[in-house]
Amino acid sequence: MKKEKAVVVFSGGQDSTTCLFWAIEQFAEVEAVTFNYNQRHKLEIDCAAEIAKELGIKHTVLDMSLLNQLAPNALTRTDMEITHEEGELPSTFVDGRNLLFLSFAAVLAKQVGARHIVTGVCETDFSGYPDCRDVFVKSLNVTLNLSMDYPFVIHTPLMWIDKAETWKLSDELGAFEFVREKTLTCYNGIIGDGCGECPACQLRKAGLDTYLQEREGASN
């Protein structure tokens, strides 16, 4: 893969930034694509652009505002509360988001001569999003290959690891401090360690605390 090109689906968050560093390590050339779907915090797009610029990565922003029109949700509507009732999908779930994002990333990848697509989806997060499942990604990979007659490979470096292991991966890639200080995970739009209260911040902090304890224990 060292001689090939990849496109990373990139939001500027912890997971996708870790995947961006992973891709830089794996491929000869890397581009990033970010989707504007009228998300609650436009800062997400600015954050992604700043990270891509700092890393010298070509960055494309695609307008996906249609998604908000079709599937209103707590990630795009400030009048909707972020909730997660037991047995139900969180209010932050956006129907069709990863289906559309990966499909458009594939179209872009083919146009720029890349066959590798990297995304930070994983099954181990609390959310249970159906479009983060390995079976979905593998199914879509086959569909994209058939639809464009092109040998795409969708990579999911985080699929089977939890947040603590994601922090460990960023550390192994030499990007731990970068990811901690410059990424945006917080639903309230606070870069770095975030607000500490929203579900995304709580998940991120729990993983960070676990990893730091493990790292400290390993060094003793």
Curated annotation (Swiss-Prot):
Q: What GO annotations for molecular function exist for this entry?
A: ATP binding; ligase activity, forming carbon-nitrogen bonds; zinc ion binding
Q: Cofactor stoichiometry and binding?
A: Binds 1 zinc ion per subunit.
Pfam families per the UniProt record, alphabetical: QueC (PF06508)
Q: What class does this enzyme belong to in the EC scheme?
A: ligase
Q: Does the keyword Chloroplast apply?
A: no
The prosthetic group or cofactor this protein requires is: Zn(2+)
As for family, the record states: Belongs to the QueC family.
Q: What does this protein do?
A: Catalyzes the ATP-dependent conversion of 7-carboxy-7-deazaguanine (CDG) to 7-cyano-7-deazaguanine (preQ(0)).
Q: What is this protein called?
A: 7-cyano-7-deazaguanine synthase
Which gene name belongs to this protein? queC
